[in-house]
């Protein structure tokens, strides 16, 4: 275990490995931290001294399919059979049943556990096995039990333990289908998604649009059927994406984001084509009046490097980040203009086989938003998909008497007890504002001010004297001694007695479980105080509901689970602790509305779809594409994490609800009466970015150029859950959802960091409306817009872009200076002519030419080193080496040919490959076709080819990023043996190709008079 200590010991965090610790320190820009390594020796029960190695412990939760049969005899029979089987394979563990859930822990070797858990998962006596913990252990904790069984009633009659086991397990099981697939897979492996380090990976990414969904939402006759449309769209996407080996990353208001591994590119396109066919079949089967006849999809596909990571803390999203995600979104938007159902980039085309390539048609080069260079796109020969046609069909649609399967009802028309808890009505006390220094110093600690519980609106309907029960869990900030617990009991007993509150407090190895009963006002007030108590952390409510009579008669029934209960069944402590930790982890990924509905004792599958008016918020980072293009994936993660934390903090503190985290974009909504709160949240977000820039002003940190725009709009949305049990989404969709993104984009043109529409302005308080807003010259969809007045709320996009490019240039110069300082150390010669010593780092504005490259006479080039150079560079960059390329390089060391055509997985592999092939001085033929070579990197490739004095053929076919021949001319000048450079499928003009060939012909004619030493590498 490793401990990171910073701020002179004021902040401490523990990590399981040194790499994770280092990544956190770098991402958090901690310069004064110290890392300590400590060894922890666990306490083990009998069986831990056997000297066994490579053991693993797995804990899971499942629901019984026949709970009525699960009595003590039933469990005893089950455990007897398991004991005989486990004894043979050397597995130990225990089984606990608390109706209707099973909790089981098994210990053994990897092979034994994999075999046993596969059989357990297929057992029909239970369902939905969810792994709570799965990891290596140094010894057996339950070595004396091959399978110990127990019914909860045989352990204790304590109601608090029964409550916590049932409520957490029920909530855990219900929330599972709402999790992002990546987070769910992490939990199945026994890993905490919140603790996982970012993982770079090569992916094929797509955005699937529900065509003209905003027009469907705007049609008054289709409001009732919107939930049906979304449900059908979600199911179709999940079925075709997961059926072809992909994963759905998220759903965003009629948009599905999904991805596939690099080796499933063809499967991805097949799945997307099948999705279009499935929706066509669905449309053809609909009766008159069904809105499902209006479902069309269009997709854009791109390939690149992305970062699979956990974004956010308070409200988290396990998702993909990276420039390729933005490009995939732009390509999908381009498909609207080109009227095609499926559009893919050149990078995706490079991954396809010859047979599928022949089916593609080039759609040309197109400029897309956020990118300086045009994008080459391709399409299949498919019928045209015109959005105007779909829009006209929607406008002419008449539902008639058709009734929706899941009708949407107006929120205000429902009885208060039936309304879903879509708004955060948590009573808020006056909370201290953080100073600028505090905010700058700690971006994580300030999240403690976020309300972690919002009470259901049905609970708020009753008076202050309504009798309620509330159960919460929390973790102790520090270990509790018997004296500490006695003090808590003494003080709490007197306080609860004066407030007419009864309940129980259970302490289990650092975990508090408390149930409070009493008048609603007193219980809520006490809970708010507990939430601020510094002795607690991670306070989460798991159950709250009205009651008719009390269960507890004492103001405080204090129980420590280290006495008779653990003497009867010691593993109970592990079950409670691990279950609570897993629940806390899940709660950050699940929509707050679902969590509130669960804590009120309801099944979230019964949430009523409603239509309601809200104030919608959207914000993202200005000029994020040019900022992220030259930043590492880890830096992109740092930027997004910092920004998301600030947004969720500001939104939740003002009573808003975070809807989605979409890369650098955050969307949220506020109640219709919360316009002022929404503006205050916007001001807090913009102020945070300004203070962040000031904090990193004097250092070369990517966060020193972060700025944002925020838009607010008002309108009606539909809130509904859709999807099957495999994946469920709580969707907030409406015409305002799309329009607010345009309002946010208007901040750049208006020069105001915060822009609101006229409906929002009408709902502001008189003081803010009359003195705090100024009209914008332009509106959105005919709706007038206003900017928040004040010099601190101005937004200068030109200055922001200038600062971003200046930051990149300054960092490049700093890197070059660092390299040159090492090169020009005493005893080494300085570079001549002011030329940078290292070709790896170029000053800004330098052209891609080999004219300024000077060979290093001391550089040792050995063909046998090519493979090791490639592997070393991949390791230094943190990438997984491509084994196929490594094998090719090894073979080329004893050959004169190297065929790497279409072998690179992405542009990130070009630099390691080019540094490796530089050592292959024996090559006569080099094939680099279909390998992401463009004008930016062809100079580096030519530099690598210059040492190949016998090179005759260079194949650069199907690299459309090539438009210039200047670097290739330099190659021909220095390597006169070159006979052919293949440029089919590039964008180099035919006239330039002919000139290049003429130069090679001249070299061939002059070959007989070639002078000794004419090659620059001959000495």
From Swiss-Prot:
Residues 825-839 have a biased composition (Low complexity). InterPro entries: A/G_cyclase, Acylphosphatase-like_dom_sf, Adenylyl/Guanylyl_Cyclase_3/4, BLUF_domain, LRR_dom_sf, Nucleotide_cyclase. Residues 55-148, 467-559 form the BLUF domain. Its cofactor is FAD. It catalyses: ATP = 3',5'-cyclic AMP + diphosphate. Activity increased by up to 80-fold under blue light. Keywords: ATP-binding, cAMP biosynthesis, Cell projection, Chromophore, Cilium, FAD, Flagellum, Flavoprotein, Lyase, Nucleotide-binding, Photoreceptor protein, Receptor, Repeat, Sensory transduction. One of its GO terms (cellular component) is motile cilium. It is found in: Cell projection, Cilium, Flagellum. Residues 846-855 have a biased composition (Polar residues). Residues 822-861 are annotated as: Disordered. One of its GO terms (biological process) is cAMP biosynthetic process. It is an enzyme of class 4 (lyase). Residues 204-332, 615-744 form the Guanylate cyclase domain. Acts as a blue light photoreceptor for the step-up photophobic response. Mediates photoavoidance. The 1224-5/9F strain is deficient in phototaxis. It is not known if this is due to defective adenylate cyclase activity or defective BLUF domains in the beta subunit of this protein. Heterotetramer of two alpha and two beta subunits. Belongs to the adenylyl cyclase class-4/guanylyl cyclase family. This is Photoactivated adenylate cyclase subunit alpha. The gene is pacA.
């Amino acid at each position: 275990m490793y401990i990171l200590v910073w701020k002179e010991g004021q902040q401490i965090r523990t990590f399981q490995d040194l790499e994770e610790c280092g990544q956190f320190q770098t991402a958090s820009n901690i310069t004064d931290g110290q890392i300590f390594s400590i060894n922890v020796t666990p306490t083990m029960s009998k069986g831990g001294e056997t000297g066994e190695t490579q053991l693993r412990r797995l804990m899971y939760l499942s629901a019984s399919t026949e709970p009525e049969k699960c009595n003590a005899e039933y469990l005893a029979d089950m455990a007897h059979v398991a004991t005989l089987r486990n004894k043979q394979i050397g597995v130990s563990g225990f089984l606990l049943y608390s109706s209707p859930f099973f909790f089981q822990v098994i210990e053994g070797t990897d092979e034994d556990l994999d075999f046993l858990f596969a059989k357990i998962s297929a057992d029909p006596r239970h369902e939905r096995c969810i792994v709570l913990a799965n990891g290596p252990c140094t010894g057996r904790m339950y070595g004396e039990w091959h399978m110990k069984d127990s019914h909860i009633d045989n352990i204790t009659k304590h109601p608090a333990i029964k409550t916590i086991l049932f409520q957490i397990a029920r909530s855990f099981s219900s929330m599972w289908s709402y999790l992002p697939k990546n987070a769910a897979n992490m939990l199945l492996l026994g890993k905490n998604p919140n603790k996982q380090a970012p993982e770079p990976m090569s992916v094929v990414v797509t955005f699937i649009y529900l065509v003209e969904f905003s027009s469907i939402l705007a049609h008054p006759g289709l409001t009732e059927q919107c939930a049906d449309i979304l449900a059908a769209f979600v199911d179709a996407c999940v079925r075709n994406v997961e059926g072809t080996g992909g994963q759905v990353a998220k759903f965003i208001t009629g948009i599905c984001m999904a991805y596939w591994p690099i080796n499933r590119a063809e499967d991805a396109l097949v799945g997307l084509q099948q999705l279009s066919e499935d929706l066509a079949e669905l449309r053809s089967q609909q009766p008159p009046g069904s809105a499902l006849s209006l479902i069309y999809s269009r997709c854009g596909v791109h390939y690149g490097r992305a970062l699979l990571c956990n974004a956010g803390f308070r409200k988290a999203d396990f998702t993909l980040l990276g420039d390729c995600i933005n490009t995939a979104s732009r390509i999908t938007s381009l498909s609207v203009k080109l009227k095609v159902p499926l559009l893919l980039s050149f990078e995706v085309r490079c991954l396809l086989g010859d047979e599928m390539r022949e089916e593609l048609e080039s759609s040309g080069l197109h400029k897309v938003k956020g990118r300086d260079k045009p994008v080459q796109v391709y399409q299949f020969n498919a019928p045209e998909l015109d959005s105007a046609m779909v829009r006209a069909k929607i406008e002419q649609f008449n539902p008639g008497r058709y009734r929706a399967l899941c009708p949407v009802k107006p929120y205000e028309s429902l009885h208060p007890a039936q309304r879903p808890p879509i708004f955060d009505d948590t009573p808020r006390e006056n909370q201290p504002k953080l100073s600028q220094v505090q905010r700058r110093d700690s971006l994580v600690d300030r999240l403690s001010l976020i309300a972690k519980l919002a009470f259901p609106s049905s609970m708020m309907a009753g008076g202050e004297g309504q009798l309620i029960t509330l159960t919460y869990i929390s973790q102790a900030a520090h270990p509790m001694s018997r004296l500490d617990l006695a003090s808590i009991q003494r003080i709490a007993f007197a306080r609860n007695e004066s407030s007419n509150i009864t309940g129980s407090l259970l302490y289990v190895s650092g975990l508090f479980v408390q149930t409070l009963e009493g008048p609603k006002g007193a219980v809520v007030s006490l809970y708010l105080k507990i939430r601020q108590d510094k002795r607690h952390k991670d306070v989460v409510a798991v159950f709250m509901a009205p009651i008719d009579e009390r269960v507890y008669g004492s103001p405080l029934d204090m129980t420590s689970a280290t006495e008779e209960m653990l003497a009867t069944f010691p593993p109970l402590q592990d079950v409670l602790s691990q279950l609570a930790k897993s629940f806390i982890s899940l709660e950050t990924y699940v929509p707050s509305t679902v969590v509130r509905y669960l804590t009120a004792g309801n099944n979230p599958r019964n949430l009523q779809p409603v239509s309601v008016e809200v104030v919608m918020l959207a914000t993202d980072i200005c000029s994020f594409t040019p900022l992220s293009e030259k930043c590492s994936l880890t830096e992109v993660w740092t930027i997004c994490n910092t920004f998301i934390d600030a947004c969720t903090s500001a939104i939740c503190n003002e009573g808003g609800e975070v809807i989605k985290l979409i890369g650098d974009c955050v969307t949220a909504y506020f109640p219709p009466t919360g316009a002022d709160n929404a503006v205050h949240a916007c001001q807090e977000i913009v102020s945070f970015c300004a203070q962040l820039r000031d904090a990193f002003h004097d250092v070369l940190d990517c966060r020193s150029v972060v700025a944002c725009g925020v838009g607010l709009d008002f309108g009606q949305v539909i809130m509904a859950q859709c999807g099957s049990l495999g994946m469920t989404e709580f969707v907030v969709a409406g015409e305002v959802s799309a329009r607010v993104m345009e309002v946010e984009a208007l901040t750049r043109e208006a020069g105001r960091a915060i822009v609101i529409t006229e409906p929002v302005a009408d709902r502001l308080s008189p003081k803010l409306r009359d003195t705090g807003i100024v009209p914008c010259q332009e509106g959105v969809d005919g709706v007038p817009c206003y900017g928040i007045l004040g010099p601190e709320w101005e937004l200068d996009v030109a200055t922001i872009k200038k600062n971003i490019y200046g930051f990149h240039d300054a960092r490049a110069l700093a890197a070059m200076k660092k390299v040159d300082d090492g090169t020009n150390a005493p005893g080494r010669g300085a570079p001549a002519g002011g030329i940078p010593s290292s070709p790896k780092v170029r000053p800004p504005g330098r052209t891609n030419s080999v004219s300024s490259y000077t060979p290093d006479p001391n550089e040792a080039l050995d063909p046998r080193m090519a493979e090791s150079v490639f592997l070393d560079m991949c390791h230094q960059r943190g990438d997984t080496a491509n084994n196929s390329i490594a094998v090719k390089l090894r073979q080329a060391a004893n050959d004169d040919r190297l065929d790497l055509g279409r072998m690179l997985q992405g542009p990130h592999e070009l630099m390691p490959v080019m540094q490796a092939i530089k050592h292959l001085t024996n090559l006569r033929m080099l094939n680099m076709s279909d390998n992401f070579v463009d004008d930016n990197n062809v100079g580096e490739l030519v530099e690598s080819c210059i040492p190949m004095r016998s090179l005759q053929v260079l194949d650069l076919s199907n690299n459309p990023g090539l438009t210039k021949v200047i670097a290739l001319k330099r190659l021909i000048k220095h390597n006169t043996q070159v006979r052919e450079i293949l440029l089919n499928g590039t964008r180099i003009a035919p006239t330039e190709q002919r000139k290049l060939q003429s130069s090679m012909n001249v070299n061939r004619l002059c070959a007989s008079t070639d002078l000794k030493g004419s090659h620059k590498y001959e000495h």
